[in-house]
Amino acid sequence: MPLKIKNIDFLFENSVTKIVANRNHPEIKLAGLTIGPFQEGNEYEVYFWAAQELAAAGIAHFREENCLAATDIYKVQWKERVQIAGQISELPEDFYPKLRRYLANTKEEIATHPEKVREHEKAVHLACDIVNARLKKIITLSSGPTQTDQVLKKFTSEERLIYEQLGRIITEWRAQILEYDNKGE
């Protein structure tokens, strides 16, 4: 991943998310950070990276609305497909970081649940469809006039990054193509 997307991912890892405690657990002290104590069934807000560790240890689980599911990916792909040409839909918050983690998790699950191969392959296919459809729209939008805030607000941070980079490249290329200097003759 390019450095900028890694930065966006870092921000996601350090954002606060909601979890639900699976069991009672005393507080956990880390260098400069205390998490918990946890009481079974109660909801807590913790950093995403801490939530992952708590989930892996079986202490807590993510709230359903904080995770991406196969149905969410299908809905996004369908929404992108039915958009009018030149229109781009708004993605759910933190869609790409959640998508990357969903794909990584389904890939890991294959080791212990081989029947999940099909689910993973379908998710990868849908993810590629989404990325390709949105990328085509972003390329078209970046090669035209500057877009309004109404259009730009529908971009994720990752998409705004590629939109801005493409816009600069296309503007520079266009200027070079149309520039004529006969002083060299």
Model regions: which residues?
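N-terminal, Lys/Arg-enriched amphipathic/low-complexity engagement segments
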Residues: 1-27
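Charge/polar-rich, low-complexity and marginally structured segments
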Residues: 2-9, 67-185
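Phenylalanine-focused residue identity feature
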Residues: 10-12, 38, 48, 62, ...
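Short N-terminal secondary-structure initiator segments
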Residues: 13-15, 40-41, 47, 84-88
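General secondary-structure edge motif
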Residues: 18, 33-35, 79, 107
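Generic structural hydrophobic/aromatic packing signal, biased to beta-strands
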Residues: 19-21, 46, 62, 99, ...
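Compact, well-ordered interaction domains used in eukaryotic information-processing assemblies
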Residues: 26-68
